Each structure stands twice: as C-alpha cells, then as structure tokens.
C-alpha cells in the first residue's frame, strides 16, 4: 500500500535555492498551517509535480514555478524536489526531479535537467539509481503508487485553483470523470475489438480462397514428386550397372598401372646405369690427374696416412696454440703500456688541479682570519690572538660570534613581545569604550523601533476598535434576544409535541401487529398446502418403507461378511453400526502413522547404510590408489638407483646412497679447489721471478741460470697441476651429477615415506571403523524392515475393510435418512387426522387476514412520514436556534473586543511615553562616551608608530650582523670541506702513483721486445711444416678417388644384372597395348549407361526445377499453415465477439456500481457535514450520450425536498467548496484502494463557522474509521488556526508544520508541537 514518507524542497517558488526544506508526512494526519502567501500551496504543487510531472496552473511553462534568478541575484537558479514514498508493494523508492531556470538576455529559459528513481536492492542492500526521461518518469510513478495519473491529479493532489472542478462546465467535468474511470481507454478498446472483428471476418474470406488455390497446387506437386520417384528408380538401376563397369575399368587400370610402373622401373634402372657410368668416367679422369700431380706416391695404407695426418695436426695445433698465446700476451703487454701512458697523463692533470686548490685554500684561510678580526673589532666582542689561527681557535671565536647573534635575536623577540603587550592593552581600552558606546546606541535604536511599532499598533488598534463599534452599531441585541426566545419556545413546543405523539411506540405496535398477521397467514398457507399434498404423502410413505427394508438387508449382509475381520482388528470387540467405520478409520490412521514412522526410520537407516557403503567404497578406492602410487614410486626410485649403481638396489638404501653421494661430491670439490689454488700460486711465482729476478718466497736474488732453472721447474709443476686439475674437474662434475640425480629423487622418496607411514595406515584404520559401523547399521536396518513388513501386512488387511465399511456406512446413513423422512410423513398424516378445516374456510380466512395486513402497512407508512416531517421541523428549529445563539455570542464577543481594544490603546500610550523618556536619557549619555572613544583611538595610533620605529632600528642592526656572520660561516665551510675531502693527502698519493707508473712502464717495454723475438722464431717453424702436410693430403685424396671408382664399377654391374632379371622393355610395352584395348571396350559400355542416366536425371532435374518454383515451394507446409491460420482466425474471431460483449457489459456494470458507491458516500458525508437546511443531499448524475456508445455526461445535482436541481450556478461559494471536497473524499474512498493519500488545500475557504466545524468533525470521523488502515494519510493545508486546532489532535499527530517567511522573504518550514 503506497504512502508518502518525506519530501525535500529547494528552489521552488519562494523556497531558498541554497537551503533544503524537509517535510515528513505523518499517519494518519499531516497538518500544515501558515499565513497567506507563506508558501503552503507550494507543498501540494511539489507533491503533484513529483508524482505526475504536471506543472501547477498559470506556471508560465515553469518560469514562475522556479525561484526567480532576478530575486536571487543570479543568472540561473537550480531547484530540486526529492520525494520518498512506499510503493503499492511496500518498497521504499525515492523520486528526484531537478530543474533549472536561466536568465537569458531577453527571456528566461526553463529546463527539467534530471529525473531519477532511487531504490534499495533487496539482495545486496546497495542503492540503485535509474535515470529516466520526464515522460517515462510520469508513467512510472503512478504505476508504482498503484493509482492512475488522473486520480493523482484530480483527487489526491488537487491545486487550490482547480479544487472546484466538480462544479465547472460540463465538458471539463466529463473529461475529468472519463480520465478517472479510464472510459476513453476502454471505449477505444471496444472500438478496436469491433474493428478487428470486422477485419478478421474479411480475412477469413481471403484465407478460404487462398486455401482452395493451395489445394490445387498441392495436387500438382504430388504428381511431379511421383514422376521424380519413378525416374529415380530407373536411375538407380543404371547406376548399379555403371558401378560394375567402373569396377572392371578400375581393375584394368590397375593392371595397366602395374605394367607402366614396371616399365618405369626398367627405364629408371637404365637411367641410373647411364648416370653412374658418366660419374665413373669423371672420377677415373680425376684419379689420373691426381696421380700425375703427386710428388711421390706413399706406400702406406689410408689408415696409416690418416693417423699420420692426425698426429701431425696435433703437433701443428700445439705450435699454433703457443703462437696464439704469445700473440695474446704481446697484445696484453701493448694494452698495459697504453693504459700506463694514459694513467700517467691523468695523474699529471690531477696533480696540477690539486696544487691549484691548495693555493686557493691558503688564501681562503687568510681571508677568514681577517673577517674574524674585523667582527671582533666592530662589535666589541673582545681581544683575539695573532694570525694565522689554529682550527681550535677558529672554532672558539666562531662560537662566540654565533652566541652574540643569538643574543641579538632574543633582544629583537623581547622587543616585539613588549610592543604587542602595550598595543594590546591600549586597544582593549579603546574597544571597551567603543562597546559601551555601541551598547547605548543599540539601546537607543531598539527603543526607537519599539516606539515606531507601538505607534503602528495604536493606529491598528484604533482601526480595529472603530470596526468593532461599527459592527456593534449594526446589531440589535434586544431583537436578537427576542428571536432566540421565540425560536426556543417553538423548539420546545415541537419537541414536546413529538414526544406526546409517541411515534416510536405506535410504529413498534403496528410492526408487531403486522408480524402477528404474517405468522397467521403462513400457518394457514401451510395447512392449505398440507391438505393438497395428503394423498401424495401416503404413497411416499409406503415407498420409503420398502426402500428402507431393502437397504437394511444390504447393510446386514456386508456386516456379516466383515464381522470376523473387524473383531480381529479391534481385538475381539464389535462396535455399534454407526461407529464402525469411524473406529476402523481411526485404527487405519493409527497403523498408517506407525507404518510411516517405521518407513521413515527404515529410509534413514538405509540412507545411513548407503552412506557408509559409499564411504567404504571411497576409502577402498583411496587405499587402492595410495598403494598403487606407493608401488609406482618404489619402482621409479629403484629403477633410477639401479641405473646409477649398475646393480640391484632396494628403496631402503636410498638415504644412505644420498648421504654417501653428498660426501663424495664435497670431497671431490675440495680436492679440485685445492689443486686450482696451487695452479693459481705457480703462475704468479713465475711472473714475479721474471720481473724481479728473485725468489718469490725467500726474496733471494737469481743469477740468469738459476732464474731459467726456476722458471722451467715452475712450468713443469704448472703443466702437471693443469692435467691433474682437469682430471679432478671431471671427477667433481661426475660426483655432482650423481648427487643431483639422487637429490631429484628426494621429493618422490618423501611422498613414498608419507604414503607408507601416515596415509595408508590412516586409511586402513578408517576402513576398519566404517566396516564395523556398517555391520551395526545393517543389523538395525534388518530389524526395522522386519517390523515394517509386519505392520504393512496389518495395514493392508485394514485397508481391505475400509471400502466395504464405507459402503455399509453410506447405506446406514441412507437408512437413517429414510427413517427420518418416514417419521416426518407419519407425523404430518397423524397431525392432519386431528381435525382440519375445509379449503373454502381457509381461503376466506386468508383473504381477511391479508386485507388487515395491507391496512396496517398503510397506517405504518403514514406514521413514519409524520415522524420524518416532525423531525425535519425540529432540525430546522434547532438550526435557527443555533444561528441566533451564534449571532448573540458574536455580538457579546464584539463588545468584549471593543473593551479590550480600548484597554490595549491605554496601555500602548503609557508604553510610548515611557519609551520617549528612555530615548532622551540614552541620547544624553552618548556624547561623553564618543569623545572618550576618539581620544583612546588617537593614543593607540601614536604608540603603534613609535614602537614600530624602535623595533625596525633593532632589526636592521641584527640583519647587518647576521650577513657578516653568514659570510664567515660560508668561508669556514669551504675550508672545512677541503680538510674533510683530504685533498692534501690525495695530492701526495697521486704523486706516489705517478712514480710507480713510470717504473711499470719500463718493465713492460722490456717484456714486449723479448716476446717479439720468440714469436718470430715460432712462426718460421710453422711455415716449414705446411709442405709436409700438403704431401700427406694429396696422397689421401688420390687413394679416396681410386676407391670411389672401384665402388661405382661394382654398382653398375649390379644394376645391369637387375635389368636382365625383370625382362626386356619391348615385351612390357606390348602387354600394355593389349590391356588398353580391353579398357576402351569397357569405357564405351560405361558411357552408354551414363547417357541413359543423364536422360533420367534431366527429367528429374526438370521436375525438381518446376517443384522449386515459388508456387510449389513448401506447398504442404503452406497448405497446412493456411488451414491452421483459417481455423485459428475463425476461433479468434468468435472469441473477439465474446470479449466485446463481455467487456461492454462489464464496463456498464462497473460504471453503474462505482457511481452508486460514490453517490452513497457523497450523501452520507453531505448529511454529516452540511449544516444548512436548503439542501437534503447532493449526488452525481450520469447519462449515456448514445445507444451505440458507452460515453457518459455528468452533472452534480442537489436534492431539496422532492425537487432535484442542477447544483452548478445555483450554489454559494461555500457550498461549492464543500461539495467539491465531499466529491473528492468519495472518489478517494472509491478509487484509492492501493493509495490512501488525500491532500486538502485550504478546505475551509468560503465556509462559515458551523460548516467548518462539521467539516472538521467529518475529517475526524474519517480518520477514526481509518485508524486500522496503515496507509491512510490525510494532508491538510490551512490558514485557519481554529480549524487546525479542531482537527489537529494529539491522537492523530505528534507535530504539525508552520510555514512562514524569514528576513530574506524565503519560505521556511518549522515543526511544532501539536495543539493541546
């Protein structure tokens, strides 16, 4: 059920575009009070715009609806309405509409900039936003609220300017009611159905013609398909013959192919003989050439020559290696010489740079010392020692200078604080005097404003008093008293007359007499009917007794057949016949419950057994898988170990083998490292002996022979160590490879160990537990199944009794029914036998009683009419008496108002004179205070100028001193930086490095000359070996060519032998010609068959092409679809006719029912609310505008006595307002089933006091009636405080809202406590 919860307004009409105003809507009442023009109606307008998107009347396309930019002082204003409501399904939704009004050069532009719906996703709890176009939003919100847009516009949220629409012109009234009833939509639906029915009738005729045409085409297509089928059969027969011929041709082709392949092989062999003969001829010539070019032929074999060449190559390789090693050493020496030359150049450049920096450092130290002396002299900081200063002296003097700078900064800070303190004190004195002057000035202005307000109030009170005196002058109090007495006497007389006539007792007496006569008439009618039906009842009695006896025999037979089984079920007891079925059914239900319980237990036990079996199966599978994995890992590890050890090894030996391989690897690595260290030691020894000509260990000088011997010994050691190092490297690599292979098996071995020690034992234990539990569960299941089978047998035996006993019980009930009918008939016949009147006497008595009854009815109607007229007179007199009393009370109130106005005038005059005295005293006190304030401000400004000058002088002195100190510190920093970087020590180091580079350069030049001589000797030796190598290579080439010639000779002889074995080429060619003739004959026969098939296929193709024409395409489906379409269209057309009639009748019935319901509510509300005597009630009259359509015209009628008049143009403004309100309440009651919201804007406009009170009472009764309805919401907007107090009671709302305007003339909404 939809309700509105809260609304935010910003920038609409007079509401501030910068601030948000929020209204919370209560249930059942939301009361909004405020003066005219405060902005109350804007709330209704915002509700209507949010829900329907329709702007209020006279909004000038939205220009006057949005806050004016000129008023806000901006070029554009933005507005927003945010409404939170519950949908008809109870879901919270927030509707947001945003607007913009822009001031252009010559006009204003209105724009709706955003329409958004927000809701909460019930699954995720997240906020979901959907943006809509305005038109979509206008359709979406009424659908969510469960009411139409017309109801929202014309019933729920009605603007004050449109609230009297029920009494507007007939066309407007018709449009409103048509929208509310959705009449136009349904009338159009009827017209569409009627038109569709007519169109479909025409389509049915067309469909029948199409179906006849399709039937003709279908028959033609059938004939074509029949012809195609016959041709296809003939084609298939010919194709079988063609297949046989093709098989024969293929066999002949295969034979031809074999012969051709044989011929091809012969020709290939012939070609190979020719190629190899040519190749042998070429190689033989090459052999002869090589033999002629040999300087001498070597008698050694090819293997001996190759071995000689291999060793020769090895010796040449060693010599080449030595030459390359010496060349590399030569290049290294030249590179070293170049590097030393470069380093020497760099050292010279850096020495020059560092010497320059040392000179600059000395100048900077002298400058620093001079600066320290100047500072101490100028600022009188004490005596200084003589220059140059040591580092410690400089540090002490610098610290004294810094300390003096800190003292100057503290002096400056103290000066600033003392200045601020003095200025603050002077300013406080000034502000104190200024505050006293402002306070008195403010008091004076306030007194002046109060005095002006009092003057204005005096004028208003005088006007009010004059108006009251004028009203009193028009009232004749004496005449009012006399009229009150007359009306009261007449009312008492009528009331007494009403009570004396005793209408209620007389009406009750007449009704009692009528009831008595009706009872007598019914008794006589029964006697007459009984008398007429006597003979028939006796025949019925006899038949009933006969049927009853037959039923008793059937019943006894069934009971005798089932008696023993019943006793067995009920443990030997046989219940009465009437309770037999009930007890058997109870026993059946009991045993069924027991059986169901056992079935449930058996299913649960079976489920547990199945679960255990599945678990056991799963554990078995897992155990099998683990054992399989264990075995595979074991085989894998043992195979790897066997491959490594070349012997059979079990998996248990793996840890020891891994540890052993690790130790062996570490030992080999340690030996290799030790040998490598020795080799690295021998090479520097040899190098140092060459360079320094002394022993590297004892540093003893060598002679030339000792040095040569030492170097030779070192080379021998290095050579032997190198070979040993290679062997150790191979052994270390092998040991590491074995360890790596074993280590890769570690993860597999760990998995194997985990499987054998943890996983498999745990699985076996689980399997054993599940097996034991399965045995227990299986025994329990067998027990339950045994008991269940026994119970099922008992249940089946009882179920076999149910059907016979149901028949017996049904027969027994029929026997009882017949017995009751027999007793009734016997009683009727016995009663009649006591003595009866004749038919004529009964008829005469009935006529007499009927005439008496009609006479009493007439008297009763007359009494009721007299009572109504009397009560109407009393009601009119009461209304006149109340009106006179109100007039009298009004006059008394006017007198009190005049007295009160005069008292207020006297009090205001006294207040005004007192204010004049206060203003005079305050004006006199302002003069001295103004002079004191100006003097204090002048003193403050003088002090501020003087103290600022003193502070600036001290600050300037401190700045000069700080600049000199910073210059000193900068110089000290550069000096310290020179020492920190140790540039003096670096100069000494680089000079030492330059001397060392010169010595190394001389050594390198000597070694370069030595290497050049030795390299030239080795290259000469290398050139002499080349000639010997060429001789060996030429002998090898000659021997190789000779061997190839002999090989080719053997291959040619072999090929010629193969050609002779196969046969001659001419014989094979003759056989191929014979086979080709047979192939031609078969192909001729095959072509003849193909021609026949082509003729048949041409016919088939022609027929198929004809079938593919558009007229035959999908002809069966089209014929079937057309038939279905025809039948379904005929059925649909009949349904449309039914729908048209049903909808037509439903619309008429719905309209009539709703109008009766609306008029009933209008009549009740009018009689409860209206206090005038000129109208009994009002109603809405609807007329059908034509016989053929369901269009209605509407008008509001008023009933005055027996006269019915149209209300429009004959009612006052107040009656119009009240009638419109009541009609809206009735429409809301009738149509707003899903939306219990109703907004009333100024409902008391043009209503007098009694009608306002009665309207308030009616609204209170409606709220009381709807207190159980959760979604009922009444929103009332009024300026009438009295009316608001009448309906604003605490049981209906805790707070009410007051709308007012602030100082900026912006509307504001304030929540206040409800009226007490």
Swiss-Prot record:
Positions in coiled-coil regions: 194-343, 648-686, 719-747, 762-972, 999-1090
Primary location group: nucleus
EC number: 3.6.-.-
This protein's UniProt keywords: ATP-binding, Cell cycle, Chromosome, Coiled coil, DNA damage, DNA repair, Hydrolase, Magnesium, Meiosis, Metal-binding, Nucleotide-binding, Nucleus, Zinc
Reaction it catalyzes: ATP + H2O = ADP + phosphate + H(+)
Pfam families in alphabetical order: AAA_23 (PF13476), Rad50_zn_hook (PF04423)
Gene Ontology cellular component list: chromosome; cytoplasm; Mre11 complex; nucleus
Binding annotation for ATP: 13, 36-37, 39-42, 66, 68, 160
Tissue expression pattern: Widely expressed, predominantly in meristematic and reproductive tissues.
GO BP terms, alphabetized: double-strand break repair; meiotic cell cycle; mitotic recombination; telomere capping; telomere maintenance
Binding-site residues, Mg(2+): 41, 160
Cofactor note: Binds 1 zinc ion per homodimer.
Annotated compartments: Nucleus; Chromosome
GO MF annotation terms: ATP binding; ATP hydrolysis activity; metal ion binding
Domain Zinc-hook per the UniProt entry, residue ranges: 648-747
Biological role stated in the UniProt entry: Component of the MRN complex, which plays a central role in double-strand break (DSB) repair, DNA recombination, maintenance of telomere integrity and meiosis. The MRN complex is involved in the repair of DNA double-strand breaks (DSBs) via homologous recombination (HR), an error-free mechanism which primarily occurs during S and G2 phases. The complex (1) mediates the end resection of damaged DNA, which generates proper single-stranded DNA, a key initial steps in HR, and is (2) required for the recruitment of other repair factors and efficient activation of ATM and ATR upon DNA damage.
Domain notes: The zinc-hook, which separates the large intramolecular coiled coil regions, contains 2 Cys residues that coordinate one molecule of zinc with the help of the 2 Cys residues of the zinc-hook of another RAD50 molecule, thereby forming a V-shaped homodimer. The two heads of the homodimer, which constitute the ATP-binding domain, interact with the MRE11 homodimer.
NCBIfam families for this protein: rad50
PANTHER family, per the entry: DNA REPAIR PROTEIN RAD50, RAD50
Name of the protein this chain belongs to: DNA repair protein RAD50
